A protein has these predicted regions:
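Acidic, metal/ion-coordinating pockets
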Residues: 2-23, 30-400
Length: 400
């Protein structure tokens, strides 16, 4: 509230004589004008620097080495949408091997060779369902197997992700914390070291610049304490709204849903698996789209699920397994995967989409082909009716 000026305490009827005005010389007036102009120039320069144009710091946790409890997000306004479309390629669960089941030859450098041509876009996003760490697991101790599974590859394997074309990785999932806090720090450090942004720890938003001056914000969700919690839908909505103030395009990637071929359909209520809550997948996806997300990408069930459109935005409920070197079952539907390729307008509006089908070998290595387009088309029709995405035989995706 503005403070009221003090009342005049002088006795009534007496006036303080006004000071005599001094004549200002022409030279003095010129000096004063010059000083004012200099001050205006300095203020303008400071404002430009503060706005961050041309040198905006990354508003992801790109330089952090541990998850933080609070949002690591600048309170900025989203820049105006650029004039060019934005392309994105995104995939599901990715594990490059773990010592207990065997690491791939050549340090994993050939794992993505068969699908690298599909991983093209201004933003290439994946779900890193493992740690990049060494030593014994914080979850399973010295070994995995039986009822405990822990996944980690050496930190040097981050180079394989970079070489494949990934620009952002989500570490919001049930295996990212298999090596505990130290493993999470190691993972983030390894990704930072090769220039890959990350999202997933509580409150984090990865923001990636795109050609033409655009920006894409990516929010990662999972139903775990070390992630932005997918069970807290109001919290997810708040984070998406914050992301929408930072970038004109917002993508949500979420590790939710029960696992296995029995769970290819998206239920209307909450999902559980082995007694563990796995989120209200349908309600979560629709809520974040209503809050401003331009694309929702799910993973976690280890199988493909259907797709729908809401408010003109695409929801892909699960992209299944993408790479699981000797760690995933690849029989039946678990071996069918895909690369989702989407073109969005500068404001996030859906322009075009394609599901490029991928199949996994018995060792979990991806290559083009398979039946995922046919499977997803059928699931979309069965689960979503009038809002179902339409998939052509070649994988092209169009709204209903």
């Amino acid at each position: 509230m503005a403070r009221r000026p003090p009342r005049d305490s002088r006795p009534p009827g007496r006036r303080t004589p006004l000071p005599r005005r001094r004549r200002t010389s022409t030279r003095t007036l010129q000096n004063r004008i010059l000083a004012v102009l200099c001050m205006v120039a300095v203020v303008g320069l400071v404002a430009v620097l503060a706005s961050g144009r041309g040198g905006t710091p990354e508003v992801s946790t790109a330089n952090a080495e541990a998850p933080r409890a609070s949002a690591q997000v600048a309170a900025t306004t989203a820049p105006a949408a650029g004039g060019r479309d934005v392309t994105l390629a995104t995939v599901g669960d990715t594990v490059m091997g773990t010592p207990e089941f065997g690491l791939p030859p050549a340090g994993g450098s050939t794992l993505f060779n068969g699908v690298k041509p599909l991983l093209k876009g201004d933003v290439v996003l994946g779900n890193l369902e493992q740690a990049l760490a060494t030593g014994p697991s914080a979850k399973c101790g010295s070994g995995s197997g039986g009822s405990c599974y822990a996944f980690a590859s050496p930190p040097s394997y981050a180079r394989n992700l970079k070489a494949a074309g990934f620009t952002v990785m989500s570490i919001a999932n049930n295996h990212a914390y298999d090596w505990g806090t130290a493993g999470m720090r190691s993972t983030i450090r390894a990704l930072n070291g090769v220039g890959i942004r990350h999202t997933g720890p509580p409150g984090t938003i990865a923001v990636q610049p795109t050609p033409g001056g655009g920006r894409v914000a990516v929010v990662g969700l999972a139903p775990y304490s070390w992630s932005q919690n997918a069970l807290d839908i109001p919290g997810a909505v708040r984070l998406v709204r914050k992301a929408a103030r930072m970038a004109p395009i917002v993508v949500v990637t979420a590790h939710v849903g029960a696992e296995g071929s029995r769970y290819r359909n998206v239920p209307r209520g909450a999902e559980t698996y082995l007694g563990e809550p796995r989120g209200e997948t349908r309600r979560l996806a629709r809520a974040v789209v209503d809050a401003g997300a331009d694309l929702f990408v799910g993973h976690g069930p280890h199988v493909m699920r259907g797709m729908e459109f809401r408010n003109g935005r695409l929801i892909a409920y699960s992209l299944g397994n993408f790479l699981g070197y000797k760690v995933f079952s690849t029989s039946g539907y678990a071996g069918q995967s895909g690369v989702l390729q989407v073109t969005m307008g500068p404001d996030g509006a859906f322009k075009a989409g394609r599901l490029a089908p991928v199949r996994l070998s018995s060792s979990g290595i991806p290559s083009p082909g398979g039946t995922s387009v046919r499977d997803v088309a059928a699931l979309s029709r069965a689960n979503f009716g009038s809002s179902a995405a339409r998939l052509a035989r070649g994988g092209a995706i169009t709204p209903p």
